[in-house]
């Protein structure tokens, strides 16, 4: 079973990510993205969806026109895990 990150691990891992913030009321991280238009936002979401399916680890997300908000947490573990960090790292790599 996958284990939640400790507070120290979470702080260390979060420091290595670009633009991700801890969610105040839960053990999760979140980032907002803004694109030129809906097509660009949807293309980004498609790339994330393909990777998430490969990882069998799916984000919570919200999209309005050119904005996408993603929240990552591992429900089975009850909080942030290495899976979330790996998906966030992938997301960072396609938005750099």
Swiss-Prot record:
Q: Which UniProt keywords apply?
A: Lyase
Q: Which domain of life is it from?
A: Bacteria
Q: What class of enzyme is it?
A: lyase
The record ties this protein, via SUPFAM superfamilies, to: PCD-like
Q: Name one GO molecular function term.
A: 4-alpha-hydroxytetrahydrobiopterin dehydratase activity
GO terms for biological process, alphabetical: tetrahydrobiopterin biosynthetic process
Disulfide bridge partners, by residue number = none
Matches recorded under CDD domains:
PCD_DCoH_subfamily_b (cd00914)
Q: Which InterPro entries match?
A: PCD_sf (IPR036428), Pterin_deHydtase (IPR001533)
Q: What is its EC number?
A: 4.2.1.96
* Catalytic activity field: (4aS,6R)-4a-hydroxy-L-erythro-5,6,7,8-tetrahydrobiopterin = (6R)-L-erythro-6,7-dihydrobiopterin + H2O
UniProt record similarity statement: Belongs to the pterin-4-alpha-carbinolamine dehydratase family.
What name appears for this protein in its UniProt entry? Putative pterin-4-alpha-carbinolamine dehydratase
Q: Which organism is it from?
A: Paraburkholderia phytofirmans (strain DSM 17436 / LMG 22146 / PsJN)
């Amino acid at each position: 079973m996958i284990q939640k990150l400790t507070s120290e691990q979470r702080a260390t891992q979060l420091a290595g990510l670009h633009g991700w913030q801890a969610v105040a009321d839960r053990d999760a991280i979140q980032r907002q993205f803004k694109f030129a238009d809906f097509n660009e936002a949807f293309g980004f979401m498609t790339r994330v969806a393909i990777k998430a399916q490969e990882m069998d680890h799916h984000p919570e997300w919200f999209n309005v026109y050119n904005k996408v908000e993603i929240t990552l947490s591992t429900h089975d573990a009850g909080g942030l895990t290495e899976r979330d960090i790996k998906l966030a790292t992938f997301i960072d790599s396609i938005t750099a």
